[in-house]
Every structure is written in C-alpha cells, then in structure tokens.
Amino acid sequence: MSRLALTPLLVILLAACAHEPGRNPIAEWVPSPNHDVRDPIIVVIHATEQASVEESLDTLRTRNSGGPVSAHYLVGDDGRIYQLVPDALRAWHAGGGRWGTITDLNSASIGIELDNDGREPFTDVQVDSLLVLLEDLAERHGIPRTAVIAHADMAPTRKRDPGHHFPWATLAAAGFGQWPAGPLVEPPAGFDPWMALRLVGYSLEDRTPHDERAAAARAFHRHFRGIDDGDDPAATLDAEDARILYGLVQ
C-alpha cells in the first residue's frame, strides 16, 4: 500500500468534516484556545515528549499562566490526526528561534506535534499519517515541499525534538524536507561547511559564539545523520558533515 494512500479513518473524517470551514477534513477537530492569526510558509515538526496522546491533548488545549502552548496538529502513535488550531491561525508552538530569514516561526509556520516520548522510534503508521498530512498542506497552502524542519533546527540551543529517531530520510523519499541529492562526494577545496550550514537555514553569523555553533552542529547531526550528541559542548562539523552539506547546497 502506498504511504500516501488515505486510511479508512481518514476517508471517514474527510466525508464527515468537509463542510467545516477552516478545519482540515483529514483530522479530528479538538480545538485549542491558544492561537492567533498568521500565514503559513513552512512546517515545523515536534515531538511531544509526554507519556500519552491524552496528556499532550490536555497540554495543548489548556490555558495556563506558565505559558500556554498549542500546535495546529497532533499525530498519535496510532496514526490518528488531531487538528487543534485552524491552519489560518497562529498556533503557539515554535517559541524563539530562527530559520533562514524567518525570525517569527509561529507567524510563518504550521506546527505538527508527534506523540512520542523522545526515546522510542516513531511508528510506521504515525509516519504514514504525517506524510498524508504534509501532502495535504503542501497542496492546499502551496508550502514548499522542502520547507519542513525540526523544532531543534530553528531553536538548537533550546530544543532537541523531534530527536535523532525521526525518519527524515523517509520524508525525503516522499519529497519533503531538505536532503542531499544523489551520492555524497568530496567538496572542493575551500568549501566552508559552516557557511553551507547557514545557507541550509541554521542561524549562524561570523561572530556566533562557540556554544551556539556546537548546538547547531548537534541539531544538524540529529537531522541528517541520526546521531544524538547529547549536550556535547565540543560538537562540531566533520568531513562527513561537509560531504552532506555540499550535497545540500550544490
């Protein structure tokens, strides 16, 4: 069966919710009050790092003085898709950070939470549903298929999710996210991997402190190599990273 084929549950939801404006018919509507208006041009992938989808739904739908959070979608480990905030509104999921020229990710993005405790691999059915959702968002909003990033990519000093278990290669095979094109080759003499990392989208400047560069390297390793460096303050870019980065920017 194709990874992008609609499951029976999604077909049922499509038929049942087609008349509801502002709501995605492939998701179950469980509204959160934590949002305001914005226009999506990118997708940010999160992991809930909580014990259950019920706990995550409660967190994402509760007003609290400690800092209310939400996301547009939550995908359960059973593949069920919940929509909490309409696509046209601004959910509060990204926090501070930057990706390329985008400095307000909440205003620019669709936030997708995945039910995952941060330690276990993501389920196949969950990834299948995510791919269906990404295809839908790309078609309806014109979001570039490459504009799918990790929460940790845009906030590497604060966040690790969705973590090193997330199958970015599977998303790339379906045409989503950035991924090297073709076999990796040695970059030419003078190739600057840190400049390439910046061109990919990571927030780096000439005077970026060492700890922030290390955090960006750790985020890159989780995303493109499936490696968890923990909080290693000495994390840096090696020869394999340079080959990957050359494949991304050439």
Language-model regions, residue ranges each:
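C-terminal motif of bacterial Sec signal peptides marking the signal peptidase cleavage site
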Residues: 14-16
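Active-site-adjacent loop/helix surface patches within enzyme catalytic domains
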Residues: 20-36, 41-42, 49-146
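Acidic/histidine-rich, metal-coordinating catalytic segments
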Residues: 143-158
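Short, well-ordered, mixed-charge alpha-helical segments that flank or form enzyme active sites
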Residues: 119-121, 156-159
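Cell-envelope/ECM-targeting effectors and their regulatory/trafficking segments
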Residues: 18-20, 127-142, 158-250
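Bacterial N-terminal signal peptides that target proteins for export
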Residues: 1-6
